[in-house]
From Swiss-Prot:
Superkingdom in the source lineage: Bacteria
Protein name: Octanoyltransferase
Species, as recorded: Erwinia tasmaniensis (strain DSM 17950 / CFBP 7177 / CIP 109463 / NCPPB 4357 / Et1/99)
The keyword NAD is assigned to this record: no
Active site: C169 (acyl-thioester intermediate)
Subcellular location: Cytoplasm
Length: 223
């Protein structure tokens, strides 16, 4: 397989911790010839604290677990009906800068939402993607040895109420929205191919290999 191939793994609904561990192991073990990967996954309910996370932004987590993450940013929520897209790209090999990658991810979401006739925008003062001032997509990355990991979380068709237990991304009173509030009937299955197509376009990637095996043991994901 060519190192230029982009492998897409559809992992279905998974707990956060094992996926995070596998993502770190993939990143630590990859080499210059390892193809880039994107993992599409939904997570069971969890709050994750980024590297800059402050405890005061966790208002009342209640019965939802709080996990520490090494991504950038503050606290956010993951749950069923939210499309998480982990982006593991060798930036050096693809000659992509960090700012260029962030812009590509944000524009990927904007373009995907436009396919549902939803007008969205990124903001320079607050990373992510917004619809009428409400946040619809969170973004958090880390770069290690020239390779990215972590990624985006796009609210599609989920229970948004857990966001009220936190200051999302560290912003008190930040309102959240989701695609089905803007375009009823939207599904993760409809969103996934659009995210991949737009992301590949923005990074000029033409060789894409889709893998669909939600029961795939995480040890098999390691290179």
């Amino acid at each position: 397989m060519s190192p230029d191939t982009l492998i897409i793994r559809q992992l279905g609904l998974q707990p956060w911790a094992p996926v995070s561990l596998a993502m770190h192991q993939f990143t630590d073990q990859r080499n210059d010839e390892t193809p880039d990967e994107i993992w599409l996954v939904e997570h069971l309910p969890v709050f994750t604290q980024g590297q800059a996370g402050k405890s005061e932004h966790l208002l009342m987590p209640g019965d939802i677990p709080v996990m520490q993450s090494d991504r950038g940013g503050q606290v956010t929520y993951h749950g069923p009906g939210q499309q998480v897209m982990y982006v593991m790209i060798n930036l050096k090999r693809r000659r992509v800068g960090v700012r260029q990658l962030v812009t590509a991810i944000e524009q990927t979401v904007v373009d995907t939402l436009a396919a549902f006739s939803v007008s969205a925008n990124a903001r320079s003062d607050a990373p992510g993607v917004y619809v009428d001032g409400k946040k619809i997509c969170s973004l958090g990355l880390r770069i290690r040895q020239g390779c990215s990991f972590h990624g985006l979380a796009l609210n599609v068709d989920m229970d948004l109420s857990p966001f009220q237990r936190i200051n999302p991304c560290g912003y008190a009173g930040l309102e959240m929205t989701q695609l089905t509030q803007q375009h009823p009937g939207a599904t993760l299955a409809a969103v996934q191919p659009l995210l991949i197509a737009h992301f590949a376009h923005h990074l000029a990637i033409t060789d894409i290999d889709w893998r669909e095996d939600p029961s795939l043991p995480f040890s098999s994901l390691r290179h």
